[in-house]
Swiss-Prot record:
Protein name per the record: Chaperone protein HtpG
Summary of the function given for this chain in its UniProt record: Molecular chaperone. Has ATPase activity.
CDD domains recorded: HATPase_Hsp90-like
Gene Ontology CC, one term: cytoplasm
Predominant location category: cytoplasm
Chain intervals for the UniProt region annotation (B): 337-549
Renumbered residue ranges of the record's region A: 1-336
Native species: Chlorobium chlorochromatii (strain CaD3)
InterPro entries: HATPase_C_sf (IPR036890), HSP90_C (IPR037196), Hsp90_fam (IPR001404), Hsp90_N (IPR020575), Ribosomal_Su5_D2-typ_SF (IPR020568)
The family this protein is said to belong to: Belongs to the heat shock protein 90 family.
HAMAP family xref list: HSP90 (MF_00505)
Length: 629
């Protein structure tokens, strides 16, 4: 055992052995659990910040505290040529016993077993089983072969100590003369990690992970962190300019946010948050589900960034929300890279979801134009929640907005507004689905409703067909697609044209059935058509044609359902066909016209697959028509 000189007295250099499980633990940390070497700096800064917080607290009551008036700060010294790094704080420091307890032993029994399990399963751990083990310090061995820690406790008569280890099985402790309170960590970087001695790289890491810690972080005389954690301040103290700049920083957006929400919660769980609504949705958010799965606000613990995009903070349909959530209540796993599935996390998520939905409701009532901008950008994503978040389903339904036959293009109506202006005789909420507003308004199925002034919701968002049918009813009024054959058509039509007599119409219907026996379920007289000769509708229990088309586009086709062809008995074409049958029931033109009308109905709704045959047949009919003149 060697010795050192301290105040003229020989003090032995003490060597200690790590326990077997500590050695295995170090190996796991260095080689398995930390996926990014830069994390080491975040961990050391976080530990320094904790030590400074304790020093600040003790200064309130301990009048004899060592260096009571010293600035509470973290100082970095880099030497790129020597590949060395020094991290020093003026925090609470450590005694010899604390050095052994904090740096020489496992923080909690059973740690190694949990760590090995984490490595094998690569999954989050239950917050009830694993706490904060405090082993983040050892991440420094990812970037160095040996680390030296010099420390002196805050007690006025405290002795200084030097702790040194290569992480290989032993560590040493010796007494030293250290004039100031706090801890100094120094080491030389491995060859492959010398980038961490470059000022630009260290500044980059500090701004990414530790920009908002409570204490200044100096590199030389230059402060690297802003320390301005806006989410910690009351909303009344926030200025739009600084909020906008902060949003651009956390969201990597060049635009100002559409709106923001400041949250402060105290109770069973405590946290603060500053959340933002972007003005626009990135295109990839609409077309790639994985984009939503991997998004979320930033998660901080004690102002230290733990997870840049924390998907566990919000349900999937709200993950377009940017911002920061900061709590001191959350249990973390050892590497701080994954948040544990804990009751605390679940509670934070529940509270955040409720407050965000309340925020949307407030915008809808108090700032409708701002809400409309938000809904146009993120409405399709919000609708996803109807099929996933059953707890908040009613709130989400109230947020839904639709264009309708009574709104201008780009304007919306809510389900509640729709119900309030329904006629007393109307029992159902009607909707029509398709590719765009113009197509929907031109569709034959809507003619009856427009003639009688019955409002129809126009669903042109692809998401609608997956979520709207699941609502079933609103305010005790069933939602009904106007494509269904069993809609209520009890109001008298103002169409003055005389319908074809039943004895003449029945042969027409029969001729259509024979011509289209393989394509349609039935051919019936229509009560909905006003100006079109035919239309296609679905049976009571059949799926909508729009949903069927979308399933095909997604390569998940459903068994094709036969449709019902409705025929307008007052239309001139139908009257002419009746005359053709009376003249010659075997006229081949009858079947040709029947098929052309059927495929024309398919064309109008976007379901026609063989456009070539349709156009060829149309040309033949035009040729026949022109020959008779």
């Amino acid at each position: 055992m060697s010795s050192t000189e301290n105040n003229g007295t020989a003090v032995p250099l003490q060597e200690f052995e790590y326990k077997a499980e500590m050695k295995q633990l170090l190996d796991l940390i260095i080689h398995s659990l930390y996926t990014h070497p830069e994390i080491y700096l975040r961990e050391l800064i976080s530990n320094a910040s904790d030590a400074l917080s304790k020093a600040r607290f003790n200064a309130l009551t301990d009048q004899d505290m060592l260096d009571k008036d010293a600035e509470l700060a973290i100082r970095l010294t880099l030497n790129a040529e020597e590949k060395s790094v020094v991290i020093e704080d003026s925090g609470i420091g450590m005694t010899e016993e604390e050095l052994i307890a904090n740096l020489g032993t496992v923080a909690k029994s059973g740690t190694l077993g949990f760590m090995q399990s984490l490595k094998e399963q690569q999954q989050q751990l239950d917050g009830n089983l694993i706490g904060q083990f405090g082993v983040g310090f050892y991440s420094v061995f990812m970037v160095t072969e040996e680390v030296t820690v010099e420390t002196r406790s805050f007690h006025s008569n405290a002795q200084g100590y030097r702790w040194r280890s290569s992480g290989q099985g032993t560590y040493t402790i010796e007494q030293i003369d250290k004039a100031t309170r706090g801890t100094r960590i120094s080491f030389k970087l491995k060859e492959e990690h010398q980038e961490f001695a470059e000022e630009y790289r260290v500044e980059q890491i500090i701004k990414k992970y530790s920009n908002f810690v409570d204490f200044p972080i100096y590199l030389g005389e230059r402060q690297l962190n802003s320390m301005t954690a806006l989410w910690q301040r009351p909303k009344s103290e926030l200025k739009d300019e600084e909020v906008n700049e902060f949003y651009k920083f956390v969201a990597s957006d060049f635009n100002d946010p559409l709106d923001y929400l400041s949250i402060s919660v105290e109770g069973m769980v405590s946290f603060k948050a500053l959340l933002f609504l972007p003005k626009e949705a990135p295109p990839e958010l609409m077309y790639r589900q994985s984009e939503l799965e991997n998004r979320g606000p930033q998660l901080y613990v004690k102002k230290v960034l733990i997870q840049n995009e924390c998907r566990d903070l919000l349900p999937e349909y709200l993950r377009f929300i940017a911002g920061v959530v900061d709590t001191e209540d959350l249990s973390l796993n050892v590497s701080r890279e994954m948040v544990q599935s804990s009751p605390v996390m679940a509670k934070i998520r529940q509270i955040l979801t409720g407050k965000i939905l309340g925020w949307f409701e407030m915008l809808a009532k108090e700032q409708p134009e701002k809400f409309k901008t938000f809904y146009k950008a993120f409405g399709p994503i919000i609708k996803i929640g109807l099929n996933t978040d059953f707890t908040n389903r009613e709130k989400l339904i109230e947020l839904l907005r639709f264009e309708s036959t009574k709104t201008e293009e780009g304007e919306f109506v809510t389900l509640r507004e729709y119900v309030e202006r329904m006629g007393s005789e109307q029992k159902e909420i009607y909707y029509h689905s398709g590719n765009n507003r113009a197509q929907l308004l031109a569709h034959p199925n809507i003619e009856y409703f427009r003639e009688h002034g019955i409002e129809v919701l126009l669903l042109s968002d692809p998401v609608d067909m997956f979520v709207i049918p699941s609502i079933h009813e609103f305010d005790k009024k069933p939602l009904k697609s106007i494509e269904k054959a069993d809609c209520d058509f009890s109001q008298q039509s103002s169409n003055k044209a005389e319908p074809v007599a039943p004895n003449l119409l029945n042969p027409v219907l029969q001729a259509f059935k024979e011509a289209l026996s393989n394509e349609v379920e039935d051919v019936v007289e229509s009560r909905r058509l006003v100006s079109s000769p035919v239309t296609l509708v679905s049976g009571k229990d059949a799926i909508d044609s729009q949903l069927e088309r979308m399933m095909k586009m997604m390569n998940t086709p459903m068994p094709p359902a036969k449709r019902i062809l409705e025929v307008n008995s007052s239309h001139p074409i139908v009257r002419n066909i009746a005359g053709m049958i009376m003249a010659d029931a075997n006229n081949p033109l009858i079947k040709t016209v029947a098929r052309q009308l059927y495929e024309g109905a398919l064309f109008l709704e976007g379901s026609l697959e063989d456009a070539t045959s349709y156009v060829t047949r149309m040309n033949e009919l035009i040729e026949a028509a022109t020959l008779t003149r």
